[in-house]
Amino acid sequence: MAYPTLPPNLLSTPNTYSDSVSPTDPEPITPELVSREPEKPAQKAAKTAMNNTSTASKPSESKGETLPCKWTGCSHISDSPDELYDHLCTVHVGRKSTNNLCLTCGWENCGTKCVKRDHITSHLRVHTPLKPHPCAVCGKTFKRPQDLKKHERIHTAEHHQLHKLSKAPTTADPEFNSRVSLSSATRIDRPRSPLSTSLSPTSTSSHSLHSSSSPFDHLLATGFHTDKSVSPTPSALALLHKKQHEELAAYQQKEMLVLQQLAFNQQQSQAYAARLAAEPFGTGAGAKRGQADAFHDLLSDVKKRKVEPVYDQDMIHRLNALVPPSLPTSFPTLPSLGGYNQYQTFPSFNGYPSLPSLHTSIYPTTAPQAQYSNQSPLPIPEIKTEADLAMFNEFMISLGRDAAANKAGPHPMTQSASGSGASNGYSASNSGTPLSETSGGVEDLFNAEELASLGLAGMPGISIHSGGSHNSNDESTHSLSDASPPAVSFGGLYPSLDAMRNRTNSAPDVSALSGAARRPIAGLPRTSMGNAHNTSTNQSTKPSYLSGMFGHSSSQQYDGTTHNYLHGLSNEHHNDYSHSANNGATNAYASFDSLARNKQSFPAATLAPKMFHNKVYRDVAPLGTAVSKRARESAERTNVEDSDREELYADQESNHGYAVSNERAREERTPKIPVRSLIASIRTLSPSTAADGEDDLKLPAISPSHVEPGTDLPPLYSIQRGGHSSGQYRRASSLSSNSTSTSGSSSFNSSLAPSNVASGTTTPRGSTPPRGVPTKRHTEDEIVRGVKRLELGPAEPLRSTTPELPDSGTTEQALERDQKPDISALSLSSSPTPPSNNPPPSVSTANEEGKDMTIEEMRRRHAALIKSWLVAVNLQWRRKKMEEMQRQQREEMEELEEGGEAMNVDERERERVEVVA
């Protein structure tokens, strides 16, 4: 499609721009409307440039000029620019599908290389007169309108402010500057160039908002585009510097605020870390949310029967994670705490105008609890039903008494019937508690009188009696008091105790102290019928739902001094049956101690070495024996017949066949040598014992018997010369000679020279044996057979190794010396050393006392914390009930008032009707 040429008369007479804008870009070249307005200089320059371009690039139809193709080696001539462009794209560029794609421009003196066909086809427009978008300032033409728009920015003053070395000319035309430099907020319909105006109707799509041409356009005043010079004016620079200074000051102020916030956060983090490091039990001083969650978790576990009111290690961790609740400011002090009455107050709240005021001083001002001063009290959780409140009260009272009991066992729970859900709750025991003996004066924290003085009497789960009355017949039996409840009551919100017992048929109250040792297993099943007041049992039980919850039924005790758990079962098994005196019903308290699992007893951990009571005997196989024969050979040596091993190796020996049977027969024919014959005493070589019939079994002596004692051996040079000196040899000790003859080779050498032994003549020690006689080398089997010939006889005391004195002439003295026990043998005796009676070193008494004081102080704090929560929850409950009562009363009064007003209106209306009638 070819664009129509412009008529000459229209190109010479235009004198204004059209305000119409084409709906789409690019826009076709259309003639512009003739206007009566005078022509402007910028329009004249644009027209001149356009005329030059048209004259140079476009041939006129009248002259019939053509467009030659200047591609290298091409002589094609086109009649129009479109034909030339199609020729370049089809013939010279080609396509990849036709296998003639060329991405290098072959136009005259060009040589541009592209990577895609679209790029080179777009580049070919440069060589053809297909640029219908000229610049109104410099006359340069562009093939796309966005290229022209980008080019027009170089003719603005803002461009020269940013680019000092720019040589592009500027224009003073206000319309051009407003069209190019105006911000998007005040954008108007942009006027077109003389050759790009259109007759098409105005489109709303042309009002698209564009970003500013320069980031500093907003710093300049409106309409500031009248300067014809390239450099900005001083007023513009001053305005720009002022704006930059203001922005820099605002940025610096913002950065300063950020740095201050970072410093503050760092200080807060350091303070929080310091508080965490100073905490003794790991409780977070700033973790108020975590502490509230900890108490709510405890309350939830109590409702779900997941925890027991036992002051154990888990409960200690739970209590350490709590802080006192928010209470009124007049909570009474605890006089029974002795020296721990220096308290620290907490923030309070207003309320309870008709109740006795309470005081929040719970913890003493000690170093471990100093961080509580920086903590705000926790909010009191809301308990919705009376059953939950009764369960909470019974749990906290039982836990508080257990925590207050310093070194006593855990205070067991008892089932109570106070409140609507008390059939499976906890209740406090009577006044006969062990706290008065061991807790050091904290026993008054949870008794009935103390709770009644705080206004808690008659609350669900709290016993209403003021004290237990002791039976005159049995001092350990405690019965419920029939006295009336205290004066502090709560109206008719809660039924009486007797009515509640008759309605729920709950279990009776049982004393928790008297029968604690007789019932080691908690939570035994029991049945109750009739009136619960007529019971005489002394057992103490826990709720039945806790009997098998934790996998064992043994009582779990916590020792305050060592923080260890003591699990044990009592050896006493009882079946207690108590009969009611009123209706003859039976309250059976069965005992199932025999069903409990026995706990394995472990030895106490000590630093002493272990005592191995059971000795382990192992068979030692002789050297050179086969593995299959070691057991039998060991039994033969020790004269122990092992029938099991005989049967075990019977099959193996049968497989060995003839060789094994021959070896066994040869061993049976070999005579056995007693061991005691090898250990010869001094008397063995005396003439009196020479003819005892065992000369062939005696080992030869080291020196001949005729050598007198006390003589020295010959010198070494005589031995080296081989001479036979006639010196005398000193007789050695008999035990020494016997000890040297116990080796295997000596035992077998005794059979080589029996004649020498009989005659008493041997080769002197100084003489050299004949070289012609070879020395016999015994094999391993012979050594084994020789060792097996040894027989172990009865044990005999070892002889003394002291040599015979020269002046001892009598045989009796020699016998006395022989009968003396050897001191070295006594030292090697295997008799056990009696154990030492010295006790192990004990721990310092001062350390134990300090530890006891620390544990006692922790117990006191926890007991006070439990009491504070007990009081806070009950007062919150009472306050809520009183508010509900007051609201109900107000509603009733309002209803009565409304009813009275309605009655008055009806009466007036009736009277008016009567008067009218």
From Swiss-Prot:
Region named Disordered: 1-65, 157-212, 406-440, 465-484, 522-543, 628-672, 686-850, 888-917
Motif range for YPX[LI] motif?
494-497
Q: Which residue numbers delimit the C2H2-type Zn fingers? A: 67-92, 103-127, 133-155
Q: Name one Pfam family in it.
A: zf-C2H2
One record GO biological process = DNA-templated transcription
Where, per UniProt, does this protein localize? Answer: Cytoplasm; Nucleus
Q: PTMs?
A: Activated by C-terminal proteolytic cleavage by signaling protease (probably palB/RIM13) at neutral to alkaline ambient pH.
Family assignment?
Belongs to the pacC/RIM101 family.
Share what the entry says about its subunit structure, partners included. Binds to DNA. Interacts with RIM20, which binds to the YPX[LI] motifs and is required for proteolytic processing.
- What is this protein's record name? pH-response transcription factor pacC/RIM101
